[in-house]
Amino acid sequence: LTATSGDTGKAAMEGFCDVAGTKIIVFYPDGGVSAVQKAQMVTQGGDNTCVAAVRGNFDDAQTAVKQVFAEVGGESLLAGKGVRLSSANSINIGRLAPQVVYYFRAYADLVRRGTVAVGERVDYVVPTGNFGDILAGYFARELGLPVGTLVCASNANNVLTDFIRTGRYDKKRPFYLTSSPSMDILVSSNLERLLF
């Protein structure tokens, strides 16, 4: 089960398309993805893929998916029927590992090209919605990569940039549909992983 603001949904459905023993259901906010993203998802082939629009925004779709995972007793009920659930989006911490790796790869490429010297710090500006990619940069720094400043870039739904600036997380604010739907988020799944 996964919620998407566009790109993850198509990528996940394509990745699991006709893979034996799997099914994938993707939920996206109706009116909250681009026309191209919607077309890619609703025309996805595969006997094991399903996509559905939900009323509301990405946060509503993601909250519903999280509730399925949090359902008390639901996991054992599903396991009894041979069903195990996973998610392809930011609520799955397994998604962070490859994101950490590409910070190291990007740094190695900069060193190889002679753009930076080994040990020289590099700043990263990261468009941020669910806080996963920038959190991966933080983890890369904790693992020893010479990361300088991590800049959290946002759009009009700037709940994270406001939080970083003020220390106050205020999700009760106007929600805007923008031309960058992956950042059209007010409830960031990965921020709690940094704080706790």
Report each predicted region and the residues it spans.
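PLP-dependent amino-acid enzyme catalytic core
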Residues: 1-196
